[in-house]
């Protein structure tokens, strides 16, 4: 009997379209002999849809016109079964699911939001869990976690938008202490959205205000001179970690832009996702640094308690031959399958391993104790606060 996999993608996020591309790519490679795919698309206005038509990338080029052919649904646990049920007056179950596969990028989705919902319903799902996903989306918190075990990170400072207006001089001085040039980023966005490199103090205000358009939390990092950007994917969970080959990404700008990542040199075909990035595999770095980065990638994956596939991005000071952990991507674009193909792991096998890890993790978690019987409510005597609890010492 085939396992029914709900592939969930889209959502209200600036990385909506990238999520669609990654999901459609993955659905083509999930083994049809073992799994039955149920596409679940969340529109930008947060409406859930299902239907086999949603596996075709062409649908999304004119979705407003074609959406009437898809089914609007809600996700529930009903009589012990996970179901997609139509909305409206006459509700009916259209699909039963065994496991969810979130393929979503950015705020409101990848940041633990969708994972939290799936945890609440109780269905197994692929990838990192709520806390790991949330940390992986927040560039400030992730740096604090990484620095706690002395992983190498670039010097940085951070602040909220309201602090920038209320304590402007203090924050500008903190940025100045980093030393220009710096790079200004929204703290919880990905895909290089809202990012600006600032070479002189006179341009910092404009860059910060641009980042504030996208986020309330801003991070400013010291720019690494003689920069080489490399990425390494990791597959596994808290028990074991396997590192992929390392790619060297080629940017047309001072940092890897949205265009570099998802469009590359292509003229018209924007359906390749991260595959469109200009890259060299394996990265052109010496063997010692290569192995060091693979180990750092696995350490980062483990300390953040990631699961499934992640991509760890690194910055290398090519003059000093020193690598810095830039950030982990808990649901990387294209699921980094192109790195695993170069590691002799075809995409269908990668997806199968991700699903297997999720099922094993769910079984492990199911053996843990998360609730127990108490007599607190039976002794509760009205709404009198702590004094109404008989037999309980304060």
Q: Where are these predicted regions, by residue range?
A:
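ATP-dependent carboxylate activation and anion-phosphoryl transfer catalytic cores
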Residues: 3, 9-12, 150, 278, ...
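Hydrophobic beta-strand scaffold residues
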Residues: 37, 124-125, 153, 182, ...
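Short, glycine-/small-residue-rich phosphate/pyrophosphate-handling segment
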Residues: 137-157
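ATP-grasp fold ATP-binding core
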Residues: 146-147, 174-195, 216-227
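Short beta-strand-to-turn element immediately C-terminal to the catalytic PLP-Schiff-base lysine
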Residues: 159, 195-200, 234-237, 317, ...
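Phosphate-binding site of ATP-dependent enzymes
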Residues: 199-272, 284, 288, 292, ...
């Amino acid at each position: 009997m085939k396992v029914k996999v709900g592939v969930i993608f889209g959502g209200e996020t600036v990385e909506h379209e990238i999520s669609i591309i990654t999901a459609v790519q993955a659905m083509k490679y999930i083994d049809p002999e073992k799994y039955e795919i149920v596409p679940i698309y969340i529109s930008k206005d947060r409406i859930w849809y299902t239907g086999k038509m949603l596996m075709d990338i062409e649908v999304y080029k004119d979705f407003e016109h074609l959406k009437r052919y898809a089914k609007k649904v809600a996700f529930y646990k009903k009589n012990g079964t996970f179901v997609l049920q139509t909305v409206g007056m006459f509700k009916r179950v259209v699909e039963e699911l065994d496991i969810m596969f979130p393929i979503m990028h950015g705020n409101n989705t990848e940041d633990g939001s969708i994972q939290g919902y799936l945890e609440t319903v109780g269905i197994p799902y692929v990838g990192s869990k709520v806390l790991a996903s949330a940390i992986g989306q927040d560039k400030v918190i992730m740096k604090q976690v990484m620095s706690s075990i002395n992983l190498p990170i670039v010097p940085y400072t951070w602040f909220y938008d309201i602090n920038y207006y209320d304590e402007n001089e203090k924050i500008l001085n903190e940025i100045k202490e980093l030393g220009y040039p710096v790079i200004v980023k929204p703290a919880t966005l990905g895909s290089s959205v809202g990012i600006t490199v600032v070479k002189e103090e006179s341009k910092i205000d404009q860059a910060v205000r641009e980042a504030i358009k996208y986020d309330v939390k801003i991070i400013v990092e010291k720019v690494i001179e003689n920069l080489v950007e490399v990425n390494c994917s990791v597959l596994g969970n808290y028990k074991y970690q396997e590192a992929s080959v390392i790619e060297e990404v080629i940017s047309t700008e001072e940092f890897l832009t949205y265009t570099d990542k998802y469009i590359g040199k292509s003229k018209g075909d924007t359906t390749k996702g991260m595959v469109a990035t200009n890259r060299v595999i394996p990265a052109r770095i010496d063997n010692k640094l290569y192995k060091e980065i693979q180990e750092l990638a696995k350490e980062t994956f483990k300390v953040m308690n990631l699961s499934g596939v992640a991509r760890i991005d690194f910055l290398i000071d090519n003059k000093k031959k020193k690598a810095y952990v830039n950030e982990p991507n808990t649901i990387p674009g294209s699921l980094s399958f192109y790195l695993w193909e170069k590691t002799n792991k075809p995409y269908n096998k990668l997806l199968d391993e991700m699903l297997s890890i999720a099922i094993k993790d769910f079984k492990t978690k199911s053996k843990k104790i998360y609730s127990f019987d108490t007599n607190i409510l039976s002794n509760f005597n009205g709404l009198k606060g702590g004094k109404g609890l008989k037999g309980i010492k304060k």
